[in-house]
Amino acid sequence: MAVLLRGLVGTDTQSYIDIIGLIDKDIDASVEIGFYLTTKVLLLLTNDALVITKILAIWMFVNFGLFFSKNKERIYIYTLLVMPLFFFDMYMNGLRYGVAYSFAILAYDQQIKKNNLRFLILIALAISFHISSIILIALLFANYLRNINGKSLFIIAAIVGAFTFFFKDRILLKLMQYSSIESPGALSGIMPLLIFILTVGLVVVSAKKQSVLFLMCVLCFAEILSFIMSRYSYMGMRIQFIIILVLFCKLPELIYFRLQAFLVMFFISLLCFTGRYRNMADEFGNGPSPFMPYHYYWEVK
């Protein structure tokens, strides 16, 4: 309800309203093709840009629900970890990457079920909404790299190569946009790094099997690189949160859900919530659509 009843709430909400306005005028707006086409369809139903952002948020909510409602362990993860860290950011702010990541984790589920057609469709949808979903997809399947053969490697290289060729202009544009955004501050990347370290600690004390070692090494290496990058560019911090989301999604496969695990998760949950709240409080009243103070849609002037 907080998402549906909100007015201009969320740092990027006004930016999305402006983007939707450009799309309504048939202007490219420098967004991914999936988001562009979806917005064009939604504009046939309503010309209220704020309503369109809420429809996208509902779509995202349904996708995440389909993934995390599969078993009780995933429900625990969604409630204790995903919601405190990502709820406000995705549902009320970063709609494009939120929808993209929701498609990416659904694709992961379909690949586990060996449903290759649905997997490819969902991968295409994820990438068409936000280019950074490629990183999420790659890390979700990182533990399969140990068993990859030459044929699979060739297919992956061909798909990545074809995608890069056809969308090279958009990829370069995104890289330029992110690289131009400087690190928010001296402590940038510290909060996601701390959350990652605590979650790795959770895996260490509650791991189901030794085979998690390879995946954890890959994620730790990626986290170190992205943390270093976050000192200089916003892109690094974005990748840090992608890595955390991957780790959260994989936890039901990695750990036993015993009392000690729940205690650690509860502590991480508090850290996630307080970190997000501090960021919102620091931006109180700043910009055209800050998170705080919260207001309802009928209060929009």
List where the protein language model places each region.
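Transmembrane signal-anchor helices characteristic of membrane glycosylation enzymes that use polyprenol
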Residues: 1-10, 268-275
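Alpha-helical transmembrane segments and terminal signal-anchor/GPI-anchor hydrophobic tails
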Residues: 9, 13-36, 136-247, 275-300
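Loop-to-helix entry region of an early transmembrane alpha helix in multi-pass inner-membrane enzymes
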Residues: 45-59
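Transmembrane-helix signature of polytopic, membrane-embedded enzymes
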Residues: 65-85
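Membrane-interface alpha helices of multi-pass inner-membrane proteins
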Residues: 87-89, 118-142, 222-229
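Short acidic/glycine- and proline-prone juxtamembrane loop motifs at membrane-interface regions
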Residues: 92-98
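Membrane-interface transmembrane helices that cradle and orient dolichyl/undecaprenyl
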Residues: 104-118
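Signature aromatic-anchored transmembrane alpha helix within multi-pass, membrane-resident enzymes
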Residues: 154-159, 257-274
